[in-house]
Amino acid sequence: MNTDVIIIGAGPVGIFTAFQAGMLGMRAHVIDSLLSIGGQCTALYPEKFIYDIPGYKQITAAALISNLAEQAERFNPTYHTDQFATHMDRLDTSFVVKTSKEIEITAKAVIIAAGAGAFDYNRIPIESSHVYEGKSLFYSVKDPSIFTSKVVVIAGGGDSAADWGLILSKLARKVYLIHRRSKFRCSDSTFKDLKSLEETKKLKILTPYQITGLRGSGGQISHIELGGLTGESVTLEADYLLAFFGLKPSLRHLEEWGIEITHNCINVDPLTCSTNIKGVYAVGDVAHYDSKLKLILSGFSEAATACHHIRETIIGGDVYNFRYSTNMNEVFR
């Protein structure tokens, strides 16, 4: 399949890059390793508020992704989720990117908006866990309502586990929060809220325990087995298991493509966001230059910079004239 721009990464900056490309008349295909678009905003903290997005006093990460996707939708970007960009080959005037699902996309330019790299979830190290994934075992939450009046076990000791413990305690019949260490990594105020909630019997904290086994049938968990550090064991009846063990980022494929990487970031020219390979750009947290600020806001600006440079110097066709969006009514009708 052919397009104008391939965008690697469908976090907030990647989605906005698709919008910017479309606004300039460029077709975009977007590749992301996670099951749904949104990057860490969707996978790790969808219900957390972000306070530094212009025009919003506050907005949840999930709402920001929804708004960005709706904004880009008018230009019909094509999303390829649940797959990695594994190969990039340079042709005379274009690039061919191949994904882990054997999809090949040809484009005149590539924009890498991969955050800290392609992400995959750190999964439960239990051989049978894949049987339950997507049915009663989840590594992120898309629809909290499915946990209403259910018994939910949450495993993990960071912000995601703690935050979802607080949120789901309002919906679930019972929430168990499991951590392999005695001390959680969440903020002191969040942990204080968890301990207060534990007094209501809606939530129970079990530490230091690890999940040692899953029992159930047809993909539906019925029991979760825990092992303590001193050898004791506990079996919980449960309907769902949420495992928040973080994400594994990797830039390995990008290094293999010959892209110049320093300290796990891609070196770019701040004036154009271009890399050491002509036609390949990087924006968002993965891009590095002097005085770089790793903010979503900065990534939005870099997306515009890269797309305008591609439209002016690579795509060709009609004469390029910079215009403000207020003078592009024919595009937004």
UniProtKB/Swiss-Prot annotation:
Binds 1 FAD per subunit. Its cofactor is FAD. It catalyses: 2 reduced [2Fe-2S]-[ferredoxin] + NADP(+) + H(+) = 2 oxidized [2Fe-2S]-[ferredoxin] + NADPH. GO terms for molecular function: ferredoxin-NADP+ reductase activity; flavin adenine dinucleotide binding; NADP binding. Keywords: FAD, Flavoprotein, NADP, Oxidoreductase. Pfam families: Pyr_redox_2 (PF07992). It comes from Neorickettsia sennetsu (strain ATCC VR-367 / Miyayama). InterPro entries: FAD/NAD-bd_sf, FAD/NAD-binding_dom, Fd--NADP_Rdtase_type_2, Ferredoxin-NADP_redctase_2. HAMAP family: FENR2. This is Ferredoxin--NADP reductase. Its EC number is 1.18.1.2. Homodimer. The keyword Oxidoreductase applies. FAD binds at D32, Q40, Y45, A85, F119, D285, T326. Belongs to the ferredoxin--NADP reductase type 2 family. It comes from the Bacteria.
